[in-house]
């Protein structure tokens, strides 16, 4: 995922996903307590899905571009400042310009993790998945445990998408595999993660699922919480595992969000199939828990919109008064009181 400079280090607090063990269960039932159990095990996940966390306005990124251009005129080799510029360009959809900034940084310092990681992210958005894979592999070779070990989940997501687009694209991974296994790897990100971890059948272990959630939720927080690819990947992780330890209600909503954001009918058919499979885990499609979840999601979305409006108003004020909008944002919105996204033990 793209590198956040030290001045924005507070994001690491917001994006932390804590792990703990899960009690073993022997039965498989769903009742009115299911949603409460899911929310207890995955507190904060609905807020991420609904966008209820502090995020910058487009005006902030325009300000940052102007500001870093001025500062870089004085310090053209300041790589951290170049990261700020590139990420701001990326956030405004100017990915080719962001890539150019990082290529210039690469010429200054060829083996810098942050530069390679940024390139791995930006090239995803230009559709060049093979290049993204190469950049991410280079970044991981320098720092295998970057972002608390989350970087590899972005690499695996890129590989999963490459296989989905073309099942022959990664022969070094798929050679010798049965066609049915390759199809599973193409259709479900959680299955691909398990395979890359050396497991080709059964449920995803809880520690593995928690680590994968760290990766996907981190990408949603840092990059784009409304990205349908990330939402589908989140649904795959939430739905996987022991039926009494997964979160099929939340998976249902993640899949539904992804389906609505995708534009192509074949993709929608795949998401409808995943929603149907998630639905099969509870007693009725009209289960009270699902209705409660949808209401909770609407509340998270409304809170997120209100928060985004407040942040934008503050940032416009800071910019107009000549203040450092980045520093002011961090002081006001990324303090120790910010809630974390956690992954707790089942009761």
Locations of regions flagged by a protein language model:
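N-terminal leader/linker segments that initiate helical-solenoid repeat arrays
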Residues: 25-78
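Short coil turns that delineate tetratricopeptide repeat
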Residues: 76, 110, 144-146, 225, ...
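Alpha-helical linker/edge segments of TPR/alpha-solenoid repeat scaffolds
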Residues: 157-177, 275-307
